[in-house]
Amino acid sequence: MNGAEVIVDTLREQGVQVVFGLPGVHNLALWEALSRSDIRLVGVRHEQAAAYAADGYARATGRLGVAITTTGPGAANTLGAVGEAWASRSPILVIATDIATTLRRPGVYRGVLHETVGQQDLFRPVTKAVFVVDAMHELRATVGAAATAAAAAPRRPTYLQVPTDLLAATFEAQRQSVARVAEPVGAGEHAQHVAVLAAARRPLLWVGGGAIDA
């Protein structure tokens, strides 16, 4: 199993059914892994559209919205849409690639294709949390943490950054116990709540801000 397959497998475990994105030379391994899975992959023509689509999907379904993009300018193109998701408390996960670990030099710009110094720092003002993978053994747990963080209250975007060489690298994958995204409440449960309220003589509702997305 390679790194891209680990990401896709973990997204499936988290209940992800749809992913939006734009392919690029750095993230092709992820696209190939998605094409072999049962996750629906929706291609767009601009990275911002991927993030907006993930936002809209999250609002319409209550599920985690996922957008994938490539390194540097591709990732930066999502910022406007991620900012909107932040303001609207939408649970979306942006997965972007980074230059290979073998090409990283702290504090040094090497001019590698699409290299952006501190790429993850672009997302800190508009996300709930930023996750950066530095080694293969961290991958499954970090993907799971990024997904569950976005979906946990208060729901907001998270950002996950994965070096390109880890997408193609293979290793002996081991199952790890990770927290999972909660499923949206079904219509049957809503009906039970309505029945309880209808039978109450003096019902009192204490409603938090999250009710707007319920």
Where in this protein do the model-derived segments appear?
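N-terminal alpha/beta PP-like core and its mobile active-site loop of ThDP/TPP-dependent enzymes
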Residues: 1-214
